[in-house]
Every structure is written in C-alpha cells, then in structure tokens.
C-alpha cells in the first residue's frame, strides 16, 4: 500500500518537472515555476505596515523593496534549487529529486456515485460542481467529481475512499472519533510525508482564480508538493474566494491520502465588524463572543478554517504592532480573547447550544507566544531592530495570563486554542535572555513552559522564522537544521514555509540526531495533532462550501449592517464642551468644513526599510460618506509642483493646496477634522529590511557610528533627552560586548502626518466661533497637548475612521459608548519612564475640562462613563497566572 502511494506521489510530482522541460512549447509550463519556497512576510502580514497594519504592503512594490511573495523560481537557474522537486526519491532521506515519466493527474472522467440497493444515502450534484452525499442520520459528505476519489459503502452508508484503495479505512469512517481516525492515517504515512504536511504555505495561490486549478497553478504546485496548509491573502473577495477554495480542496483531495488543506487568514475586518483595539474599546466580552461567532461563520463560508489570531500581546505605549492587539491591559485582553476564541472555535445549534467542534468552527492560533508587546522602543520584531522584548519590571507573567487562564482553558467544548510563536527574544531587565539567545520558535524556555503545562493545541511558527524574520539565534544554522531544531523544541506547523526539499533534509537530520524512534515520536505528535484538528473541523468529510450561501453572508446588506452596529459600540468620545448632544444638530443637514491633509510619505518598516516616500494630499475624512449627512465644503488640491519622482512626474508639496476661504468656513455649523495619531517608529540609520537580514548577517551585520532614533507619540519633533543612557537589549558584538541601542539625546523628526496638525491649526484659526470637532483614528496612545486645546469635541476611532458613526454621533443619533484602551501620556517624558512590560504605569494627560485621559476613560451624553465596564477594568492591572505556577517554572528554568 505505502509503496503504491509513494509511486503515485513520485509520478505526480514528476509531472511538474517534466512539464518544465517543455519550455515555450505547446505543453503547459511547469507548475513549479509559478511559485517558490522562500516567500514569506508576516504570518500576520495583514497586520504589519507602518501606517495601516491591514493594508496591502505590495500595492506599490517599487516603494517597498523586493516583494517577499514573488516567485524566486520564475527564472530557473537564478533562484537556487527548486524546492518542489520530489523529496521521496529515497523515502526518509534528503537528497535530490529524481525524474520520471509525466502522468495526467486529472485525466479521469467525471465521477458521480450511484447509490446501490439498500443504500442509506442520497447523492446531489451541487451548482458549485461538487457532489453532496447525505447519509441518513449520519455525516453529509462533500466530494469532487474530478479528484479521483470515489465512494465506498459499508452498512448502506457512503464513505469517501480518500486513499483510493477501494476499501474503507478507519480514517475514512466518519462513525469513528477524530482520535481513532487520526491514529489510522498516521500509521499509513511515511515519516517524511508526515513532516511535509506540516508546511503551512505563504503562497497558496497567485491570483485566487475562480477557474478550475490546472497543473500550471501555484495552488496545484504547493498542494501536490505535500503542503496541507497555507494563508490566504484574498479573503475579502467573498464568493470568488469560496470558488477558489473549493477548487483547492479538489486538488488536495486527489492526492496525499486525500488530506484536505487548512486555509488560514489574518485579521481582515470582514463585513466591517470591529476587531483588535476597536473591539477592545467596547470592553464587552459578550460582544466579542458575538463577533467571534459571526466571523467564524463568514470565514467558513469562504473556505477558511483557521484564524491567525487573535493577537493578545500586551502592548507597550510605543509598540509598532499595537493596533492589532486588545490594548495594554491583561484582564481586558484575557476576557475578550477568551470570549472571542471560544465563540470562533465552537459550532452552535439554532438554540445557541455549544456543540463543540463542527461545520462553523474556525481554529485559532492565538499570538504571539509570549511577551511580544514589550519590544524596546516599540520596534517591530519582524526586523532585527525589534529582535528583543524587554522585561525591566520582571513582569513576563502578566503577558502569559491570557494564555494559561484564558485560551488554554476555554469555557466551551473545544478546550484550547492553538498558538503562534513570537519573533522576539525575551530578556530581563539586565538584558539576560529567557532560555538563551533564541527567538520564540526556537526558545526552550517558552516551549518548555507549554510542555510543563501540558498544552495540547497546535503550535505554528510566525512567518519567515526559518529564513529571515525571527531567525534570531539560528543565523549560523542551515535551513534544514533550523527546521529540525524547531521541531525538537516543540513547534508543529511551519508558518509561511514551502520548501519540500528542506523538509526532507530536516526529517533526515531529525532521524540522524535523535534516532528513528524519537524522530517519529516528534513528527507523529505534530502531524497527529494537525490531522485531528482538521478531523474536528469536519474537513476530511466535507471540505467544500456552498458559494450561494457565501454570497448571502459575506458582504450582504445584513452583515454590513451588523458590522456598522459593532462600530457604533466602539467610538470613544474623550472631549465634549456641549457642542454635540442627544438633541442633535440645529439643521437637518448641517454644513461642515472637512480639510485636506498632507503626508510626507516617509516610513520605516521591516518590509520597505527607510523609505523617504513622496508627498500626498488627501481628504482628512471620507467626504462621500459624510455627504450623506452633511453639506460638505473642503479644500482644493492644486497641481503638484515638487521634484519629479522616478517616473518623471512632479510630486506634491505642502504648498500645493488652496484652503477653503475663511469666510466660507465661518459660515459652517461645524469644522470636522479627521486625523491619525502621530507615530514615529524607533529605528537605526543602518536599518536592515527583514528579508536581507541573513545576507547582511553573513556579511558582517554590525556598523560603526550607528544612530538610533526614538519612537515618538507626538506630531512635532521630539528630542529624547530623558531616554535610557544604555539600552536594555542589544546584539552581542564580535568583541563580546552588547550593542547599545539607546537613542538618548537624538531627535525624532516631525511625524510624516504632521500635516494633520497643520490642517487642524488652520481650521481652528479660520473657524472663529464655529465648533471644531476632531475625529482621531488611533492605534495606540498619543501626546494630546498639541491637539486637545484646539478642539471642542474629540472622538476616537480605533484602527480606522468610521465616518458613518462619527456623523451619527455629531447628529445625536448614536450615543458614544467606547472607552480608551491605552493610557494617553502627559508627555513623552512619561513614555520614556514607562517600563515596557508593565501595563498602565504612566501619568496621563489632563484636558481643559479637567478630564484625565486614562485607560477606560470615555464620555457619553451624560458625561463621564462610570458603568460596570469601567469599574471592572479600572482596577489595578493583574499580574499573576492562576492556571500555571509560573514562578516555580521560572525558578527552575531561567
């Protein structure tokens, strides 16, 4: 049986190699030229750009450096060895792929099962093309008519013959529990096969086409290579994505024992529902559960079965990735994450009863384990500047609470979530690493903690940890040794990794270092958990989705209305001098002035490095959306007069604007200025982008006379006179000393969006007696002394502007209900005094009305909110894990 399977696999994989030899002839191009193995920006790639963590960082690829998602094998011979060569030429060993005659994988005629006499099932051809097989009182199956998989009968019931041997194997028997089915499948597989399915590809598709998958497609290449997981970058396409997912599952069903593909997704704000900090501002775990349940339904409807989140890092004030978290408070993060994950992972009947795992369940990889919110200077840990998370307050335990007391001990029937490892190396206040100089995927201290606890969920690495990001500590190891070490330390799935040849070599190395029995124990544990999760998700029996239902659910008027309702709960009012109230505006359609704002385009990111950018003008809020509620006047953008860009086109300068006349502004009912919180990331002037880090390391990474720049939470330039003289963290230099990353005395320039403040200053000056309303889009705290004195009303929109809700609040139709999830510091000196690992330890800004902008502060029509949420979450931050004796573990292992 195994020999036959391996031969079939050998032939199928070799199809790709033989097609490559055809070049530009009439035969299709080789599918292995459509993708590559070195891909990988963040597994949370949706949540990590300098300005908008959910924006596409490759919208302007020429500005962001090389695209890590590009195919390095598009020009054979230039990109290194092909990672999709056949690793099974010598099962259990590494080595080169061998050639064999090509075969046609999808040559079989369309298959539709015909129930025999006494059959207890019915067969329906769906409009989507897959076959639905409904067993009486049993499982409903989904089957592709072109995958080669047929039906076998037993006791009158239908079962999918996933390994195509004409028999009913236990793993194909839906009457058995997931553990028993998993055990049978694992017993049928070779060691290197089990290792290969642990690949979680960064590149499951190139165009997410709605056309059937061909042998030229990336989807075919990756899945026929053996990967059985991968992230989608296109989940918002709704029905089109569902069609692609169905086609991908048909390919997966055709080979590799019919194992389905786990399609994962980053946070995506699907249907406009609030997530991360915008969900946190509601401080409502019940709403988090509702959103988790609805999000899971929508994800499953597009074919997604795993969520790369939620991000439960306890964020420091300057953390670059703060916008993807639930804020800075451990109790709030614990409550929201537990409710959200519990609801996402469970399936519910019509009465709301928790059924545990089922057809509506989405598996969660809670991230980033653990402590990633405490990076020094807030630096992004994808890049070597953010290599370390620091714990000067000896408070790592507070960053573990959400895991051990929450998502590892869910109140529902699914028990526990999975986890994603962090990139950073955790160090104490003296700069001494927890578990040695190892990033999260390799770290024995963090992985050992999970083992000591008895964690039985899936562990996936963050993206790129075997190649460029989070490879910290393993730089001198070849890739197969990195992968083998990761498995030895306890990780299961390899996030963003595609290279089957490296996997074959890593498995051989695992056997060499540990012996066959121990190597199989390591791989079997990882593969078994992965298979069992997909069994629990009902993926083996029914991996297909009804795209008509997708269209009804995703992007529908009903789902959009629900998304808007969640947004209404999230907006925070922190100042109101009486300008707005429940009584509404005096006019039916008030007249408002909305200015344009200038942005220099400067950015520093782990993807694009130091990018001077180019200037741009844009309306400070969505004028089309606001025009439904207001008579809007605005500015006029003139032709650009700045220096030409690389294409010879003039660029915009701060002077290329004609502001609305002051007399027109004075005739308005309101001035409404949309702003984005100021944020300047901490970086050094020899900044190394993530995917050239290894090359830089190999060539001698360390530079003399490096200047480090401070993070800043204000619009104006900031000189860090009170910063640490010596940084806590730093790489060990060739002479054995530690690099000093201090930025004391260095000045951060004006924020790239300093134009927001200039627009407010002009509007305030021109307004006269016209009330000025600021709508601030935020992802963290900020210094308000530049803004607050100029505004009569301030509304905070976490993650992004919500123009409909802002308009409703101004018109008195919606009462603000949100609360601040970050302290707003009095000044930057408070930020410098703050200990990165200690929540809520700053003196906060007090405004002209006497209100202090502290955590859990917010106003409604009656004034300062003081409800049960405020009473619950205003208590002193918790710092002790209840479900795990961390102090004992630390004493024994640090």
Question: Which residues does each predicted region cover?
Answer:
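Bacterial signal peptide processing site
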Residues: 23-25
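G/A/S/T/P/Q/N-biased, glycine-rich low-complexity segments that form flexible N-terminal tails, linkers
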Residues: 45-50
């Amino acid at each position: 049986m195994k020999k036959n399977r391996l031969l079939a696999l050998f032939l199928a994989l070799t199809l790709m190699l033989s097609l490559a030899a055809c070049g530009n002839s009439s035969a299709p191009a080789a599918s292995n030229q459509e993708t590559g193995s070195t891909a990988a920006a963040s597994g949370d790639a949706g949540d990590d750009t300098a300005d908008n963590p959910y924006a596409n960082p490759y919208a302007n690829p020429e500005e962001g450096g090389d695209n890590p998602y590009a195919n390095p094998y598009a020009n054979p011979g230039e990109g290194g060895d092909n990672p999709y060569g056949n690793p099974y030429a010598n099962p259990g060993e590494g080595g080169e792929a061998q050639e064999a005659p090509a075969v046609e994988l999808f040559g079989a005629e369309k298959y539709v099962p015909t129930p025999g006499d006494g059959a207890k099932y019915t067969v329906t051809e769906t409009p989507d093309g897959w076959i639905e097989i409904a067993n009486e009182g049993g499982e409903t199956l989904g089957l592709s008519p072109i995958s080669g998989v047929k039906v076998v009968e037993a006791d009158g019931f239908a079962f999918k013959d996933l390994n195509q041997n004409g028999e009913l194997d236990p793993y194909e028997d839906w009457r058995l529990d997931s553990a028993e089915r998993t055990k049978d499948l694992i017993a049928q597989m070779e060691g290197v096969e089990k290792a290969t399915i642990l690949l979680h590809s960064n590149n499951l598709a190139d165009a997410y086409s709605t056309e059937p998958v061909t042998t030229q497609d990336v989807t075919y290449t990756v899945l026929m290579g053996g990967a059985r997981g991968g992230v989608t970058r296109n989940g918002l396409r709704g029905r089109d994505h569902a069609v692609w997912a169905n086609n991908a599952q048909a390919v997966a069903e055709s080979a590799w024992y019919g194992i389905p593909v786990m399609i994962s997704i980053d946070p995506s704000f699907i249907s406009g529902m609030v997530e991360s900090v915008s969900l946190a501002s509601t401080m409502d775990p019940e709403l988090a559960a509702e959103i988790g349940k609805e999000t899971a339904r929508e994800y499953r409807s597009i074919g997604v079965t795993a969520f790369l989140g939620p991000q439960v890092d306890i964020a420091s004030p300057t953390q670059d990735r703060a916008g993807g978290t639930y804020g800075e408070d451990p109790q709030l993060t614990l409550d929201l994450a537990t409710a959200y994950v519990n609801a996402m992972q469970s399936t519910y009947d019509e009465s709301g009863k928790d059924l545990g795992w089922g057809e509506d369940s989405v598996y969660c990889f809670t991230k980033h384990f653990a402590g990633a919110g405490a990076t020094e200077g807030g630096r992004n840990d994808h890049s070597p500047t953010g290599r370390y998370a620091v714990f000067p307050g000896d408070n790592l335990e507070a960053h573990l609470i959400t895991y051990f007391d929450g998502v590892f001990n869910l109140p529902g029937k699914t028990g526990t979530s999975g986890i994603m490892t962090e990139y950073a190396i955790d160090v104490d206040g003296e700069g001494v690493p927890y578990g040695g100089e190892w990033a999260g995927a390799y770290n024995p201290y963090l992985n050992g903690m999970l083992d000591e606890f008895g964690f039985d969920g899936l562990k996936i690495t963050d993206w790129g940890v075997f190649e460029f990001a989070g490879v910290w500590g393993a730089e001198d190891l070849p890739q197969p040794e990195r992968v083998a070490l990761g498995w030895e330390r306890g990780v299961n799935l390899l996030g963003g990794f595609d290279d089957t040849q490296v996997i074959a070599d890593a498995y051989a190395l695992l056997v060499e270092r540990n012996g066959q029995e121990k190597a199989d124990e390591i791989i079997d544990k990882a593969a078994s958990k992965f298979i069992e999760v997909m069994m629990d998700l009902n993926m083996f029996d029914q991996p297909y989705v009804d795209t008509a239902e997708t269209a009804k659910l995703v992007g529908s008027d009903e789902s959009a209305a629900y998304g808007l309702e969640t947004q209404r709960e999230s907006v925070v009012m922190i100042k109101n001098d009486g300008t707005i109230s429940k009584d509404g505006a005096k006019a039916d359609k008030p007249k408002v002035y909305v200015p344009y704002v200038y942005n220099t385009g400067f950015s520093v990111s782990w993807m694009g490095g130091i990018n001077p950018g180019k200037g741009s003008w844009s309306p400070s809020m969505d004028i089309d959306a606001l025009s439904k509620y207001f008579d809007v006047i605005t500015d006029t953008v003139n032709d650009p007069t700045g220096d030409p860009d690389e294409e010879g086109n003039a660029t915009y300068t701060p002077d290329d604007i004609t502001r609305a006349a002051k007399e027109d502004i004075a005739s308005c009912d309101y001035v409404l200025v949309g702003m984005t919180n100021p944020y300047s990331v901490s970086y050094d002037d020899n900044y190394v982008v993530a995917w050239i880090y290894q090359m830089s390391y190999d060539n001698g990474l360390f530079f003399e006379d490096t200047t480090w720049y401070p993070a800043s939470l204000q619009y104006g330039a900031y000189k860090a006179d009170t910063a640490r003289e010596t940084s806590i963290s730093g790489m060990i230099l060739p002479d054995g000393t530690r690099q000093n990353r201090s930025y004391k005395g260095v000045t951060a320039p004006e924020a790239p969006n300093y134009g927001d403040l200039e627009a407010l200053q002009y509007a305030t000056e021109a307004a006269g007696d016209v009330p000025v309303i600021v709508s601030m889009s935020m992802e963290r705290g900020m210094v308000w002394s530049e803004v607050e004195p100029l505004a009569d009303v301030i509304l905070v929109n976490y993650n992004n502007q919500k123009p409909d809700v802002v308009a409703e609040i101004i018109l008195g139709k919606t009462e603000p209900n949100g609360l601040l999830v970050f302290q707003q510091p009095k000044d930057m000196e408070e930020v410098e005094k703050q200990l990165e690992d200690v929540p809520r330890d700053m003196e906060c800004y007090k405004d002209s009305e006497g209100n202090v902008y502290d955590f859990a502060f917010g106003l409604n029509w009656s004034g300062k909110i003081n409800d049960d949420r405020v009473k619950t979450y205003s208590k002193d931050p918790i710092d002790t894990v209840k479900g795990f004796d961390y102090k004992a573990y630390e004493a024994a292992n640090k």
